[in-house]
Swiss-Prot record:
Its main location: secreted. InterPro entries: Neurhyp_horm, Neurhyp_horm_dom_sf, Neurohypophysial_hormone_CS. GO terms for cellular component: extracellular space; secretory granule. It is found in: Secreted. Vasotocin is an antidiuretic hormone. Pfam families: Hormone_4 (PF00220), Hormone_5 (PF00184). GO terms for molecular function: neurohypophyseal hormone activity. Residues 1-19 form the signal peptide. This is Vasotocin-neurophysin VT 1. It comes from Catostomus commersonii. PROSITE patterns: NEUROHYPOPHYS_HORM. Belongs to the vasopressin/oxytocin family. SMART domains: NH. Disulfide bonds join 20-25, 40-84, 43-57, 51-74, 58-64, 91-103, 97-115, 104-109.
Length: 152
């Protein structure tokens, strides 16, 4: 009986200990894979901004939009498997400079004088695209102003 007891105990211990090992790790360990940092989803008029939270869209040319229809594309950020990089300098407790004078985290935005200095715009923002967005906004304002004059 003792001859079969020892191999049985070893077999049981082996079975129990192999259940404790993580089986789905990549070769070389979890830190062997390169960081897959990506930019956050584009949002706002002309996709000129980046998502800072599920309902926050900010860009250097447009400021910050919170809870507006332009932020709907930011909701899909919650469903993506990897985190994103918003860009900008760190500010506040856990925020980043999102627009000139504005510091945002994933939940809210606050005015912050640290962000008045040289806000780093997103790498993918094309200056010609920003000009067209600014031009679109200016044209809309002019159209609204001219409509207001005709009504009087």
């Amino acid at each position: 009986m003792s001859d079969s007891f020892l191999p049985t105990c070893i077999l049981c211990l082996l079975a129990l200990s192999s259940a404790c090992y993580i089986q789905n790790c990549p070769r070389g360990g979890k830190r062997s894979q390169p960081d897959t940092s990506r930019e956050c989803v584009s949002c706002g008029p002309g996709n000129a901004g980046r998502c800072y939270g599920p309902s926050i869209c900010c860009g250097a040319a447009l400021g910050c939009l919170v809870g507006s229809p332009e932020t709907m594309s930011c909701m899909e950020e919650n469903h993506l498997p990897s985190p994103c990089e918003t860009g900008g300098r760190p500010c506040g407790d856990e925020g980043r400079c999102a627009a000139p004078g504005v510091c945002c985290d994933s939940v809210s935005c606050v005015m912050d004088s640290e962000c008045l200095e040289d806000v780093r715009s997103d790498q993918s923002e094309d200056p010609s695209r920003l000009k067209t967005v600014s031009g679109e906004i200016l044209l809309r304002l002019l159209n609204l102003a001219s409509r207001g004059r005709r009504d009087f």
